[in-house]
Amino acid sequence: RQRQMCIRDRRKDPAERKRLINSADFVFLCLPDAAAREAVSFVENNHVRIIDASTAHRTDPGWTYGFPELSPEHREKIRNSKRVANPGCYASGFISICYPLVKAGVLPQFYPVFAYATSGYSGAGKKAIAAYESDDKPEELLSPRQYALDMNHKHLPEMQKISGLAYKPMFNPIVDNYYSGMVVSIPLQGRLLQKRFTPEQIRDVLYDNYKDSNFVEVKPAGSECVPDGFLTSCLLYTSPSPRDRQ
């Protein structure tokens, strides 16, 4: 098809957006939730395929969750779907751990899951990025900061639903003074599991789930798997801790 460009001063013109959306094969939405829903409402044919990066459709039963590494079934659904919701950043790390463990019966659906995560500020929005990158940024931005203390983080619904958990997890996100990257940790209490699992067994469950993946790599148990204690890659790594007595 011939390429069509939306003139900059018409990019918020509903009629122009509607015309371009319906003339496209694929539409990528990088918009706030309300604007993403509006854009989807413009579709008037059956051939347009949409990939939405917002939170708007991640738990919508009419949409496919766009995490192909989770399973062959996920890959097949994405391949055939015309509506794909891109996973959230924290949710990607959380679900990559919980989904295989729930699926394999290691993690009970009713387990009281707690997750701790630290991330850079790039996903916090334009205002936050500007504040962090300002020459005169306030002193409080120099240190890690907790947020979403009301336990109502916008990623919680997808974290629960896609992982197959009966309840929303307790989630403690922290933003720090660096641009991008995150670490998501989920401690498991062995005495609360249905039976005893060693770190090696848990690692094997994760490895079997992701052994054919190009973008998820399961590391050996222990910090020695990380050179110098740091990761400098866009890949997703998982690694169980070797503390099997808790």
Residue ranges, per PLM feature:
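N-terminal Rossmann-like NAD(P) cofactor-binding subdomain of oxidoreductases
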Residues: 1-4, 8-147
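Short secondary-structure boundary micro-motifs
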Residues: 51, 223-226
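FAD-binding beta-loop-beta segment adjacent to the flavin cofactor pocket
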Residues: 226-239
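Detector for Asparagine
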Residues: 22, 45-46, 80, 86, ...
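Conserved small/polar residues in nucleotide/adenosyl-binding loops
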Residues: 2-10, 237-246
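Active-site-lining helix/loop region of Rossmann-like oxidoreductase modules
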Residues: 14, 99-222
